[in-house]
Amino acid sequence: MFKYLIFGITLLISVNSNAQKNITGKFNTEIVTTHTLNYALHVPKSSKEKKPLLIFLHGSGEKGTDIELVKVHGPFKYLKSNSLDAYILAPQCPDNEYWDSEVLYQLILKIQKENNIDPNRIYLTGLSMGGWGAWNLAFAHPEMFAALVPIAGFVDRVPMIENCKIADIPTKIFHGLVDDVVNVDYSITIYKKLKKCNPNISLTIFDDAGHDSWTRVYDNKEIYDWMFQQTKK
C-alpha cells in the first residue's frame, strides 16, 4: 500500500466592497489530501544488476481493493505462463477515483528508490482508463519514460494540443476498429498529431476488435521484446 500527501496553498485577494471603502486582504490556507494506492510488484529472479521497470495501468473494471484484479489483464496475466526479466508495477485505482498522474509519479519514485531499477529503461502501458492514464502520465513526466504503449484509451484535450511534449518517447498505439466504449478516432487523431514530431510512433487498428484490443497485445511476447529494447535518450 502506498500513501501520498498533497499540500496546497491558496491565496485569495478581496477587492471592491460595495460601500464607501475598498478592502484588500490576504488569506492563506493549507489543504492536505491523502491518496492511497494498492499495488502489485513483480521482482525479477536476479536483481543484482539494474533491471527495467514496466508500469501497467488497468482499466475501470479492475478498480477497488482486491489486488488480484490487476492480474486479470496485461503483464501480470502474461507472467502466469511466461517470464519477464524486469520489475513489473501494477497499481490499483481505488473505487470512485481515476488515475492521478502526480500520485502515480510519486509511487514510481518510491519503487525506484527501493529497487535496483535502470532509470533509462522505464516503460509505461495501460488499457482503456489505464490507456488514458498512461497518456496523461507520459505528458506530465515525459522525461521519465523510454517507451509508451496506450491501448484503447481516450485522450484528453491537453495531450491533443501539447502532443510534441512526448516527441522523444517511442510509442505504439493499439485500438479496435469497432470499439463502442472508446472511439477509435481518439487514437487516430493523437497519432496524426504525434507523427508530425515523433518519428518513432505506430498505430495498429484491429479491424475485428471491439473495446478489448489489449488481450492480443499483452499475450504476445513481441510487445515486451520491443519495449525492453528501448532506452531513454
Where on the chain are the PLM-derived regions?
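Bacterial Sec-dependent N-terminal signal peptides
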Residues: 1-21
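A domain-start/cap signature at the N-terminus of enzymes
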Residues: 17-53, 127, 132, 137, ...
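Primarily recognizes the serine-hydrolase "nucleophile elbow" in alpha/beta-hydrolase
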Residues: 112-114, 120-166
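The conserved beta1-alpha1 loop
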Residues: 55-59, 152, 175
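C-terminal catalytic histidine-bearing segment of alpha/beta-hydrolase fold enzymes
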Residues: 170-174, 180-233
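Short, proline-enriched alpha-helix->beta-strand connector loops that line the catalytic pocket
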Residues: 84, 166-171
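Active-site machinery of serine-nucleophile hydrolases
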Residues: 51-53, 57-105
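Gly/Ser-rich "nucleophile elbow"/oxyanion-hole loop immediately N-terminal to the catalytic nucleophile
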Residues: 46-49, 96-129
